[in-house]
Each structure stands twice: as structure tokens, then as C-alpha cells.
A protein has these predicted regions:
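Active-site neighborhoods and metal-handling regions in enzymes and metal-associated proteins
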Residues: 2-692
Length: 692
């Protein structure tokens, strides 16, 4: 247990609740803990005589869909962006290519959000390093699409050779619409089919066919890799490790047995799994191939009587080999996945393939091979005919094409996973307590700290915690206007000094052996303006509203999104990112299928045991950014009534880090909201002061 100085353990007066006329205050009492004690000055707003005006700490939260992946190192090549485009276009006329346009997405062959540096092709060709975006290059134009989280970043990073397409803005065409507009009818659009999900490739194919364009799969030739040449980073080759059962909660045999029951119910003989976190979760393995995500590059095929892991065997340690052998899992070379798909199809295997995650290369290989099998068996009646199954998703005699059952199972945490998440969050909170006190003292003493200095120091505090492995994404450390860049990543020599006269947004997270954290706080080390306080308070009100939400079972996340935005909406403000994303247990900091977002297409219900972030925000371009983010887990709550006989759900907090009250405009808060803030800080003090 951490040893707290005696003065740190001595509480200030704590009123049972604060009235609207009370002055909310929080005092940092030790470099180890942030006791959330508020002083009730009764009817006056002045400080008591012996009380020093407190500095309060918060951090801000990031968007739900994606935090920045490990950013691409732009110093790896001296090629000018124009030269890269010229070299790429020269390949368009190469024999066997013959295309008019080429699309470069952000993903790797597994549709990962965070990817290894050697697969950051879109970043290499465009110079834009955000985690989400699509580059399209024609013979005379180059355009990049990204969403609202990255508009400002893309403006800074793209050269004049590129057109920035702000996805979602009025009048901005989609990639399909743009291609149909700029290409002459009958054009050929090339893609690497490993980098597109089957669904995405089919959508693209159908859209461009309206102008008689052809989608060309370039299986054996990624054009960006050709021009990247020797400067391209080597593929990762770090060892895999076994994820201990005390953290996993379920052994591999139990997980495989449950999955095979799903195969029987679906009428499938085997399932092909390509999502890296699904493979890691199912096999109780963790890796280090992808920055910030404890996963390894692999494919997995689970049949009724065996399973095959396609992975570079140089990563497999003796412990991992024994672990897999005991679970009945065989090893295969990573690059032999297409050969195995062909072999299974030649035997008439009805494979379960998730079109939203399995890449187009695998899907197309299976469809061609199974068609050949059906033809050779004179089964022409079922050769190409598809049907709709009872879930409303496509399937047929040739295979089962529906969402992977692993995603949902992984999202619903068991008791061991929840315990690990709780414990890791408390250790993380202790590190943040030390960090915030250090930062306050440094700023107070006049230190000139850059945004990178701050991020590095936070990493230093976290790395001292037991079980720490890595950050869970690149720390977003933004002072002033940089805080408005939702996925800002400071760079040495280019970043700003943390300014005590401006808002400072810090969004960070960590990977521990037993859990994954993600927290954002926004703070001010000087005197915030009335505008900053109002915006911050309204973001806080949205955060509180979502935290306190109670809803019937089977409610999808989009239903709750308005809880977090309502206070901002009242004065005509909003934010361009989702409100909440799923979080893995010692896995990816972003995971599905659940989310809390204005995108109402995701009908995944929130279920007891799921973890989501609660991170509303507000951003004024070139001025400041505000986010407040905690992680929550879903649990059943008791209600006096159960309309329709259904259970009702709510949230419990995983994150316990103070929220800076200096930024709160008390006149906007209700008594209930003040109570929430007081109670939360009481919990922070109670839990974190005792944590290890």
C-alpha cells in the first residue's frame, strides 16, 4: 500500500452536500493522492482565511471510434510527397496493373484500427498520420478523406498536392461519388484486396459500377510497398505470451467449446477469424506486434475437431507452444491462409466468414474455390444462389456470412476480467495522482514544459506501477488550440509549451497485464474565462447525465448518446465524435460491437458486463478543446418497477481521477449534479488513497 504523508490523510471539512451557493473546491494534498475534498463556505464565495486556492485537475476524453495509432515516423524517407505520387502513378501502367486510380485505406489485412508501422501505407503516401482516413490517387489528382476528429491535423499535414475531403460535411462527396465524377466511364480502380473488408470491397464495386468502372484486385502487388522499397520498416517479430487464466477468467477449451456450439447452430463446419483481438481473446494469448495493442498478427480457423493458428512461428515461445498444444491448436505459416481456404473449400467446407472483418482476398478466394467445388459436384442449383438466414444476414449452401460470434462474447466481461479492469484502473489512478501534483508544482514554479515533456513524464509515473506494459494509445497532450485537434499528437521540436493561461487537455491510457485504461481530463492552471467555464460545465453535465442513465435491457448505445449532448445542444453547441466506445480487458482500447454514438446504424444492445467510455467534449477550432472521459461498465440496477417484465441497466465507474472544479460554473449545476461531483470525489479519495 502506498504510504501517504499524515497531512495528506487529514481531511478538510466536507459538507454532506453542496448548495448552489457553495464554492466548489478541491485541494491536492499529496503527490500520491488527489483527495476529492470540497470546502463548504456556506453563504459566501470567498475562501476561508487559511485556505489556499486549489488547483484542480481534469483530463479530457477522446472520440469513441479511434484514438491515434502509433504515428508514422515521417523522417524515414526524404522523398517529397509529390515524388511519391509521381512514382505511384508510374506503376498504374505496369503490365498486369493497368489502372486509372488506386485506393489506399488505413487498415492492415485484419481491419485493425492500430497497425504496425510497416503497414502504415496511407500515412507514407500522404503524410497524414491520423488513424482514420482513405487516400485515393488518380492519374492527375490525389484526395484524402477523414472525419471530424482529424480535420485540423490533416490541414497541417497534407501538402498542396492533396485535396482534403472533410467527410460528413455538407457537399463533400464520398470516395465512390468522387471517383465516378473524375474518372471517364469504364475506368479501372485498383485495390489491395487484403486491405479491404469483404463488405467494403463489395460496396465499392457496386458503387463504381454505376459508371461502368471496374474494381481490380491486385493480389500480389501493393503499389505503395513497391515505391516504399528498402525504407519500409520490417514486420514486427516480438514473442507472444500466455494471458494468465486468473486474468482471462475462462480457459481456451471452454471458449472453443462455446464457439463450436455456435458453429453447429449456424450449420457451419468451420469459422475463419481474422480480427486480431478476437484471436488473442479466444486463445488467451497476447502479443506486441501492434503499438499499444497487445495482439499478434495471425489468422485462426476453428473446425469442429481442431483449430489452426496461422502465425510466424518465430514468435511462438515454448510456453505458448505448450499452451496451444493443450488446447488442440495447430500452427500454420501466416502466409498460408489462402492455401488453407482453398483446401477447405475443395472439401466442401461451409465456412463462417464475417464480411465486415474478413478481407476481400480471403472471401474472394473462398467464393471462387467453393464455386469450383460445387460445379465439379454438379451442384449447380446451389452454386451461386444465396439465401437469407433467420438473423436477416446472408448465407447459403456455400457458407455462412454473418457477424462473428466472438465479438459479442469478448465484449461481455466475466468476473475475472472486470476485477482486473478495476484493479488496473486504481493503480492507474495512483500514477495520475502523482503526475498531476508534479505537473501543478512544476507549472507553479515557472517551469517551461512542452506537451511532449508532459506526456513523457506521465509515462514515467505509469511505468512504475505493477503490471504496466505500454500505453494504450499515443498520449494526446494539447495546450490551448492544440486541444481542439481531437487526436492531436505532439512532436518533439514542433509542439507547444503548456501555457498556464490556456486550457490543457490530456487524454491517455495504459496497458497492464490485467486491464486497459483510457481517461481524459481538461485543466486550467490559471484563471479560465467565463466562456471556457460554461463550455466545460456543459460537457460535465453531459458526462454526469450519461453516467447516471438508467435504461431497459436491449437498449442500443445510440439511444443514450443524447444524454451526453443535451446540455451543449441547449446553447447550440455539439462535438464531432461519438460519446462512447467499447474497451477490451487487457486488449484493444477500442473494441466493438457496442458503442454510444449518434450513428444509429449500430443496434448492438448494451449488456451487463460490457465496458464503454463516457467522453463528451467540445472544441473551438484554433482556440481550445474540452473532454471529460471515464470508463464505465454496464450492470443491472434495481428499479421499483419492471415495465414489460424486463430488467433495467445502469453504469458503474472504473475511472477514479478528480475533475477540476475551478472550471465549473456552479450556477449552471443542479443540486443533484453537485451531489454527483461531491460523491465522485469522495469515491476517488476513498479508493485511490488506499490503492497500491
Amino acid at each position: 500500500m502506498y504510504s501517504l504523508p499524515s497531512q495528506a490523510m487529514r481531511p478538510l471539512s466536507l459538507s454532506p452536500c453542496l448548495t448552489r451557493s457553495s464554492y466548489l473546491r478541491f485541494r491536492i494534498l499529496s503527490s500520491l493522492s488527489l483527495p476529492p475534498i470540497f470546502h463548504n463556505s456556506q453563504t459566501r464565495l470567498s475562501f476561508s482565511k487559511n485556505y489556499t486556492r486549489p488547483h484542480l485537475f481534469i483530463r479530457n476524453c477522446t472520440s469513441i471510434t479511434a484514438k491515434p495509432s502509433s504515428e508514422f515516423n515521417r523522417n524515414r524517407t526524404q522523398d517529397a510527397p509529390d515524388e511519391k505520387l509521381r512514382a505511384l502513378r508510374e506503376l498504374f501502367s505496369r503490365p498486369g496493373v493497368n489502372i486509372d486510380a488506386y485506393i489506399i485505406p488505413s487498415q492492415d489485412a485484419h481491419q485493425s484500427e492500430f497497425i504496425a508501422e510497416c503497414y502504415m501505407r496511407r500515412a507514407y503516401i500522404s503524410g497524414f498520420t491520423g488513424s482514420a482516413g482513405t487516400a485515393v490517387v488518380t492519374k492527375d489528382k490525389a484526395a484524402l478523406w477523414t472525419d471530424g476528429r482529424y480535420f485540423l491535423q490533416a490541414e497541417k499535414q497534407l501538402s498542396s498536392s492533396w485535396i482534403l475531403m472533410r467527410s460528413g460535411n455538407h457537399g463533400v462527396p464520398t470516395t465512390f461519388e468522387w471517383l465516378n465524377d473524375v474518372l471517364a466511364p469504364g475506368g479501372r480502380v485498383g485495390i489491395d484486396p487484403f486491405l479491404f473488408s469483404s463488405d467494403a470491397a463489395e460496396e465499392l464495386k457496386e458503387a463504381i459500377a454505376k459508371k461502368n468502372h471496374e474494381l481490380v484486385y491486385l493480389y500480389d502487388l501493393n503499389l505503395v510497398d513497391v515505391i516504399w522499397k528498402e525504407s519500409r520498416p520490417k514486420p514486427p517479430n516480438k514473442p507472444i505470451r500466455v494471458h494468465a487464466l486468473k486474468y482471462a477468467g475462462l480457459d481456451v477449451a471452454s471458449k472453443l467449446s462455446s464457439l463450436r456450439s455456435d458453429l453447429v447452430d449456424a450449420g457451419s463446419s468451420a469459422i475463419v477469424i481474422s480480427m486480431l483481438d478476437e484471436i488473442a481473446w479466444l486463445l488467451n494469448l497476447r502479443g506486441s506486434d501492434v503499438p499499444h495493442s497487445p495482439v499478434m498478427y495471425a489468422y485462426l480457423i476453428v473446425e469442429m475437431d481442431r483449430a489452426k493458428l496461422f502465425v510466424d512461428d518465430s514468435k511462438v515461445t515454448p510456453d505458448v507452444m505448450d499452451h496451444l498444444k493443450n488446447a488442440g491448436v495447430e500452427l500454420r505459416p501466416y502466409n498460408s491462409i489462402l492455401s488453407e481456404i482453398k483446401s477447405l473449400a475443395a472439401q466442401g467446407a461451409q465456412l463462417w466468414l464475417d464480411p465486415s472483418s474478413v478481407n476481400a482476398a480471403i472471401m474472394n478466394t473462398y467464393e471462387i474455390a467453393i464455386e469450383k467445388y460445387l460445379t465439379s459436384n454438379n451442384n449447380k442449383k446451389s452454386k451461386t444462389k444465396m439465401h437469407t438466414d433467420t438473423t436477416g444476414q446472408s448465407g447459403g449452401p456455400a457458407g455462412v456470412f454473418r457477424t462473428s460470434p466472438i465479438a459479442f462474447s469478448k465484449a461481455v466481461k466475466n468476473s475475472a476480467e472486470l476485477e482486473g479492469m478495476l484493479n488496473s484502473h486504481l493503480r492507474d489512478a495512483a500514477a495520475l495522482a502523482q503526475f498531476w501534483v508534479w505537473l501543478e508544482e512544476e507549472i507553479h514554479n515557472g517551469a517551461k514544459l512542452t506537451e511532449v515533456d508532459v506526456a513523457d513524464k506521465l509515462l514515467e509515473f505509469r511505468s512504475k506501477q505493477s503490471g504496466f506494459l505500454d500505453t494504450s494509445f499515443d498520449t494526446i497532450s494539447g495546450s490551448g488550440a492544440n486541444g481542439a485537434i481531437i487526436h492531436y499528437k505532439p512532436e518533439p521540436g514542433k509542439c507547444s509549451v503548456v501555457d498556464s493561461k490556456k486550457l490543457f487537455l490530456l487524454d491517455s491510457g495504459a496497458q497492464y497485464v490485467d486491464g486497459t485504461t483510457d481517461i481524459t481530463r481538461t485543466v486550467h492552471f490559471g484563471e479560465p474565462t467565463a466562456r471556457e467555464k460554461e463550455c466545460f460545465t456543459r460537457v460535465l453535465q453531459g458526462h454526469i447525465a450519461l453516467d447516471q442513465a438508467i435504461f431497459p435491457q436491449s437498449t442500443p448505445g445510440f439511444v443514450l448518446d443524447a444524454f451526453a449532448r443535451s446540455s451543449l445542444w441547449k446553447i447550440g453547441l455539439d462535438y464531432r465524435h461519438g460519446t462512447g466506445h467499447g474497451v477490451g480487458a487487457a486488449l484493444n482500447v477500442h473494441e466493438g460491437p457496442q458503442s454510444i454514438s449518434f450513428r444509429y446504424g449500430n443496434m448492438t444492445p448494451l449488456v451487463e458486463g460490457m465496458i464503454v467510455s463516457n467522453e463528451p467534449g467540445y472544441y473551438e477550432d484554433h482556440a481550445f478543446g474540452i473532454r471529460i472521459e471515464n470508463l464505465l461498465y454496464v450492470k443491472e440496477v434495481g428499479t421499483p418497477n419492471r415495465f414489460g417484465g424486463v430488467s433495467y441497466l445502469g453504469f458503474e465507474k472504473l475511472t477514479f481521477v478528480p475533475i477540476q472544479t475551478k472550471l465549473v460554473d456552479l450556477s449552471l449545476l443542479s443540486a443533484a449534479e453537485i451531489d454527483w461531483l461531491n460523491n465522485y470525489h469522495s469515491q476517488v479519495w476513498e479508493k485511490v488513497s488506499k490503492s497500491r
